[in-house]
From Swiss-Prot:
Keyword Ribonucleoprotein: yes
Name of the protein: Large ribosomal subunit protein bL19
Known role: This protein is located at the 30S-50S ribosomal subunit interface and may play a role in the structure and function of the aminoacyl-tRNA binding site.
GO biological process: translation
InterPro entries: Ribosomal_bL19 (IPR001857), Ribosomal_bL19_CS (IPR018257), Ribosomal_bL19_sf (IPR038657), Translation_prot_SH3-like_sf (IPR008991)
Gene Ontology CC terms, in alphabetical order: cytosolic large ribosomal subunit
Organism lineage: Bacteria, Bacillati, Mycoplasmatota, Mollicutes, Mycoplasmataceae
Family, as annotated: Belongs to the bacterial ribosomal protein bL19 family.
GO molecular function: structural constituent of ribosome
Keyword match ATP-binding: no
Keywords: Ribonucleoprotein, Ribosomal protein
Length: 130
């Protein structure tokens, strides 16, 4: 491999590493998160929140994305977010859920109380409740 080729590969890695976000929180399927997205309207930007259940996480590095499901006006909406995208302003963890699958597509078929997910409380909160 020539030195020119290795330089271009290194420069590509540098560009990708500069675009990676380091402020992402740790979450997984079953958790409820709020994603704040920048939306351009004319010449201005505004922030729109999308809060829902994480159905799937996928990819690694710059391609890491997440599918979030929420109910809006009686209709369920699923949206895919590439988390290292510049349009993502912030991601906030609302609550942790206990599921045994990494991709919880079965939640689409459930309705009402059957669609609930058991909440996991941090140890401090669990001790305070008891």
């Amino acid at each position: 491999m020539s030195s020119k080729a290795t330089k271009t590969v290194k420069s590509k890695f540098d560009i990708i590493n500069n675009q990676l976000r380091d402020d992402l929180i740790d979450f997984r399927s079953g958790d409820t998160i709020r994603v704040d997205v920048k939306i351009k309207e004319g010449y201005k930007f505004r922030i729109q929140s999308f809060e829902g259940l994480v159905i799937k996480t996928q990819g690694s590095g710059i391609t890491y994305s997440v599918v979030v499901r929420k109910m809006s006006n009686g209709v369920f909406v699923e949206r895919t977010f590439p988390l290292h995208s510049p349009i993502i302003d912030s991601v906030t963890l609302i609550k942790r859920g206990k599921v045994r699958r990494s991709r919880i597509y079965y939640i689409r078929k459930l309705s009402g109380k059957a669609a609930r997910i058991k909440e996991i409380m941090p140890t401090k909160q669990a001790k305070e409740i008891k």
